[in-house]
């Protein structure tokens, strides 16, 4: 209370304004008056506009966003009360005493010292209208929205678009960014149509509503809605095509800082070019990135930029999927009309991915004694009798020293001795090979999710292989070790590495990843990625 029957409204201004407009329409006079602290002195006050609402027109409503909504609400009320009987029923509700069926206003008076605390408590946890909510309401508004013949169809199409964008397969092809509070996936579509930049959207999630859809100076609502539908259908066509899906998804993953700008550019190209020209342009963009620092696949190594390596391995997986699809599609006996597999970009964005050494790196990276103990136990299981042979007296001696001291430097010496012996006995890829084909070469690297990679630390190849196969879904539930592992998505090429699918000779050994295995693996990369590095035709 401010005295003299004046009150400061903490919460409920919209409800009071709605009641005011109802009363003005039903009785033609003010039930109370408003004073606004933030009225612009350069335009008529909101209180004056409310007072004269019955005589205001659409032209004056366009001067101010508040005037527009007040005007719209008043005319919605007038349309609602076209039936005089309905108008009288509402008057009866207002005029009856409170002990009869009537409308009463309830309010709470708060001490001035507690007004800010009360406001916070009242609004805590409220769900505010999003940009999408506002645009949907604008389009479907009975008074000022789309023409009546379009509204019903628009409501159904709007719902279908929202549902399709909730499909993670579709969404992560075009955008891998995490949405902030108040942002929606439909906003992305509206931003594309409105020409909203990513930087503008990050600052104001309602930018496209304020600056385009609610701007009466721009095209009419029907034209704007048509642009939304056409843009969505073009995106959906890109998703439905196995080639554009994979190439756009790969480029989005590689450069996800500015998805609005990227998709805007690709949409423009898609409108201008034929389908085959568009696919060629996408592949050309990928080629430029892959060959920016490396002119050949064998120039890549563990020391290359990790972002570049991730794209290289991603494209190996993508081209493996696409070329397999082409082989099956060309076989008339199979009658394959649609794609049979799509790379799940949502998992690329949601999970963390490592560049993994197939044959473990010689350097020890164990952070605590528990990890070191677990690794030693796994080594004894994997090597079996080889570990306890008399010739391994040096290893036994180092193990005794470490078991007594538990010092990291003593473990590192033991670890190095074990790894060197393993490499020597199994033809595993060596460290510091004179021809440069060491453990840092591209043929000893693959893409693996961080969780699986770090779960087995620097395990030997046989154990890594078992981890990968079990994580990929082939497990024995009665086996304690295998049942403890969490199923994960294993990219096709990573799976083929650890199952040694690239080595088709009859000399195959499952005890280690050899240089021969690495050479066959790189050969497949060169074949699958030939267009990007050898200027082969598409």
Label each region the model flagged.
Residues 1-538:
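Flexible coil/loop and intrinsically disordered segments
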């Amino acid at each position: 209370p401010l005295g003299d029957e004046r009150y400061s409204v903490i919460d409920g201004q919209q409800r009071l304004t709605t009641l005011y407009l109802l009363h003005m329409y039903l009785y033609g006079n003010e039930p109370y008056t408003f004073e606004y602290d933030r009225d612009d002195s350069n335009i008529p006050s909101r209180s004056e506009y409310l007072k004269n609402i019955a005589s205001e027109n659409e032209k004056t409503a366009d001067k101010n966003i508040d005037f527009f909504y007040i005007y719209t609400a008043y005319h919605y009320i007038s349309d609602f009360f076209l039936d005089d009987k309905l108008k009288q029923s509402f008057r009866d509700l207002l005029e009856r005493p409170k002990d009869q069926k009537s409308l009463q206003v309830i309010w709470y008076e708060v001490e001035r010292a507690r007004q800010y605390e009360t406001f916070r408590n009242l609004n805590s946890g409220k769900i505010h209208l999003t940009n999408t909510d506002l645009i949907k309401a604008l389009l479907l508004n009975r008074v000022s929205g789309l023409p009546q013949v379009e509204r019903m169809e628009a409501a159904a199409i709007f719902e279908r678009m929202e549902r399709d964008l909730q499909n993670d397969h579709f969404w992560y092809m075009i955008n891998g960014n995490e949405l902030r509070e108040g942002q929606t996936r439909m906003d992305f579509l509206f931003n594309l149509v409105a020409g909203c930049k990513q930087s503008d959207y990050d600052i104001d999630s309602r930018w496209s509503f304020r600056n385009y859809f609610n701007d009466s100076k721009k095209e009419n609502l029907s034209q704007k809605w048509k642009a939304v539908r056409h843009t969505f259908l073009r995106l959906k066509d890109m998703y439905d095509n196995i080639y554009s899906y994979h190439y756009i998804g790969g480029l989005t993953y590689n450069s996800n800082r500015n998805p609005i700008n990227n998709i805007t550019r690709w949409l423009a190209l898609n409108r201008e070019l034929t389908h085959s020209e568009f696919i060629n342009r996408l592949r050309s963009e990928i080629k430029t990135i892959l060959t920016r620092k490396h002119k050949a696949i064998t120039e890549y190594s563990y020391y290359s930029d990790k972002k570049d390596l991730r794209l290289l391995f991603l494209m190996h997986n993508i081209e493996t999927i696409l070329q397999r699809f082409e082989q099956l599609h060309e076989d008339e006996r199979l009658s394959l009309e649609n794609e049979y597999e799509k790379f799940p970009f949502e998992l690329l964005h949601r999970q963390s991915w490592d560049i993994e050494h197939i044959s473990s790196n010689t350097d020890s990276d164990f952070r605590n004694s528990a990890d070191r103990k677990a690794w030693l136990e796994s080594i004894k299981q994997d090597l079996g009798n080889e570990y306890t042979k008399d010739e391994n007296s040096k290893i036994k001696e180092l193990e005794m020293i470490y078991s007594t001291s538990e010092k990291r430097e003593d473990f590192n010496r033991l670890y190095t001795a074990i790894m060197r012996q393993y490499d020597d006995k199994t033809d595993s890829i060596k460290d510091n090979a004179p021809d440069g084909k060491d453990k840092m070469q591209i043929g000893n690297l693959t893409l693996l999710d961080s969780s699986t990679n770090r779960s087995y630390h620097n395990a030997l190849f046989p154990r890594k292989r078992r981890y990968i196969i079990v994580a990929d879904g082939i497990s024995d539930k009665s086996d304690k070790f295998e049942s403890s592992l969490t199923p994960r998505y294993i990219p096709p090429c990573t799976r083929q590495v650890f199952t040694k699918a690239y080595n088709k000779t009859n000399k195959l050994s499952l005890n280690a990843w050899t240089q021969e295995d690495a050479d066959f693996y790189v050969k497949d990369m060169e074949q699958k990625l030939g267009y990007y590095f050898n200027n082969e035709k598409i």
